[in-house]
Amino acid sequence: MSNSRQHQGHFARKRFGQNFLVDHGVIDSIVTTIGPARGQRMVEIGPGLGALTEPLIARLATPESPLHAVELDRDLIGRLQQRFGPLLELHAGDALAFDFRSLAAPGDKPSLRIVGNLPYNISSPLLFHLMTFADAVIDQHFMLQNEVVERMVAEPGTKAFSRLSVMLQYRYVMEKMLDVPPESFQPPPKVDSAIVRMIPYEPHELPDVDPVLLGEVVTAAFSQRRKMLRNTLGDYRETIDFDGLGFDLARRAEDVSVAEYVGVAQALAAVRR
């Protein structure tokens, strides 16, 4: 596989984190994993040169119900519009600022399926942005750096367990689906990649907790992850009865379950009312 940054006449732009998927076997496996069906309301983030876009459109799109796509690179937008016409509705702009709820069906029922080969340089901020629309989403399938996927699905007590793990596991059921090697891309990235499936919990399954407070607690806990929680959460000891919660501060952040972090955030909410 060539290391050239040019593919199909387009130069991959480093500032957009562009690595184009070119392995047709991998593309078929990804589309099978996603399982698109006619008439579904699907959004692709960063369609690039259309490697996933084409088979997705073939399986689900009609002029009345097109595939939606959010793309920042204006050079690619013109090519995609010309290639797919009314079967693809393009939204020019940054996915980090895009209102995905604007594409949801009317009503309270989740209706969006979101997919994409996410730019690795903005993957974590984008995942947190998407979290704010989770109630409108049926599922998400993303290509990400394998290290990020491992952190997303990591269990407590492992080195990979992190702030990202806690915040996403609170909101989604997640599963690593496929490994994707560097040679599947043009130009090949310097890291391994993987596909992750993310299914939001339904409202009745979610704990009653303010995600902002949960984020505050988790960020503090992981701010110095090699230190004991008695140090990183020390500022909360005057307001939260950790002993009453059965919360052992003689641990590190990676050793605490999502449910325990939720409990601390709930206790914090109670004293701040």
From Swiss-Prot:
It is found in: Cytoplasm. One of its GO terms (cellular component) is cytosol. Pfam families: RrnaAD. It comes from the Bacteria. PROSITE patterns: SAM_RNA_A_N6_MT. Specifically dimethylates two adjacent adenosines (A1518 and A1519) in the loop of a conserved hairpin near the 3'-end of 16S rRNA in the 30S particle. May play a critical role in biogenesis of 30S subunits. Belongs to the class I-like SAM-binding methyltransferase superfamily. rRNA adenine N(6)-methyltransferase family. RsmA subfamily. This is Ribosomal RNA small subunit methyltransferase A. The lineage of its organism: Bacteria, Pseudomonadati, Pseudomonadota, Betaproteobacteria, Burkholderiales. The gene is rsmA.
